[in-house]
Amino acid sequence: MSSGASVSALQRLVEQLKLEAGVERIKVSQAAAELQQYCIQNACKDALLLGVPAGSNPFREPRSCALL
């Protein structure tokens, strides 16, 4: 029973390695350039860079009623 589980685990490992071997690889310099370009293009939509408008911030402290 243990050898059956071992064979099954090895078969899964072989399948995983086949999948990983089929992944297209690119150079780190190319990946870094693409990532940098992506960040520059999407900086205008990044809430961490621009901040969240006070009116639409779901994490702000709730205000108390001014009438009370």
Swiss-Prot record:
Name the record gives this protein: Guanine nucleotide-binding protein G(I)/G(S)/G(O) subunit gamma-10
Function according to Swiss-Prot or TrEMBL: Guanine nucleotide-binding proteins (G proteins) are involved as a modulator or transducer in various transmembrane signaling systems. The beta and gamma chains are required for the GTPase activity, for replacement of GDP by GTP, and for G protein-effector interaction. Interacts with beta-1 and beta-2, but not with beta-3.
Localization annotation: Cell membrane
Residues spanning the signal sequence: none
Main localization (coarse): membrane
Keywords: Acetylation, Cell membrane, Lipoprotein, Membrane, Methylation, Prenylation, Transducer
Cysteine methyl ester: residues carrying this PTM: 65
Propeptide regions on this chain: 66-68
An MF annotation (GO) of this entry: G-protein beta-subunit binding
Residue positions where N-acetylserine is found in the record: 2
PANTHER family: GUANINE NUCLEOTIDE-BINDING PROTEIN GAMMA SUBUNIT
Organism, scientific name: Mus musculus (Mouse)
